[in-house]
Amino acid sequence: MSSLSTTLPPTPPTADPDAPSQIAWPDTEPHRWLASLLNGSSYAYIVAPMVDQSDLPFRFLSRRYSSNLCYTPMIHSRMFTTDVKYREKFMPKFDEAKHPMGGPVFHQFCGNNEETMLAAVNLLPSYCEVVDINCGCPQGIAKRGGYGAFLLEEGDLLVKIVSTLVTKSDRRVTVKVRDDA
């Protein structure tokens, strides 16, 4: 599968979130895929991932108040592959996108090794269609582990991780970065 290497076009705020956008989305496969996730909405209301907060009840609540895309909390790829209790905590129990209160979920992983990241992604059930590489976490633990925002300092490694996931998994791959500008 191909990766989504684009950002949403800017849209002006409006009282009606389903009002047609003034900006035409390019007719590319990634844009068509993203539009399909939004169920026809011209706007993406995304609940960004939050450590230990973006769990299932929070995602359900977020969707109740208009979010149409949600992330899981950051999942550590090495721990997901080696620690059974950790994996049980973060392993999806059902297809959230098909639940009446659910919707699309981006399963966010952090790590600094392409094979470990691939092994973690391959443990997910097949209905988990999208994985996200965390390149935004600025916390000290991410710095010590060489992942999150600090992975951006290792461009060659990041390219290896993205390339490995895109070519060797059957999931969509996105990368979350932090823009502190």
Sequence positions of predicted segments:
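A short acidic, helix-capping loop that chelates divalent metal ions and anchors anionic groups
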Residues: 79-81, 140-145
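Active-site glycine- and acidic-residue-rich loops that bind
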Residues: 113-116, 156, 172-181
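Alpha-helix-loop-beta-strand connector modules within alpha/beta enzyme cores
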Residues: 91-104, 151-175
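Active-site-proximal loop/turn and secondary-structure-junction residues that shape catalytic pockets
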Residues: 76, 111-113, 137-139, 179-181
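Glycine-rich, positively charged N-terminal anion/phosphate-binding segment
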Residues: 19-41, 50-126
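A structural motif
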Residues: 67, 128-130, 170
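Non-cysteine beta-strand/loop elements that form the S-adenosyl-L-methionine
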Residues: 72, 130-138
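Conserved non-cysteine loop/helix-boundary elements of the Radical SAM core domain that shape
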Residues: 77, 145-156, 181
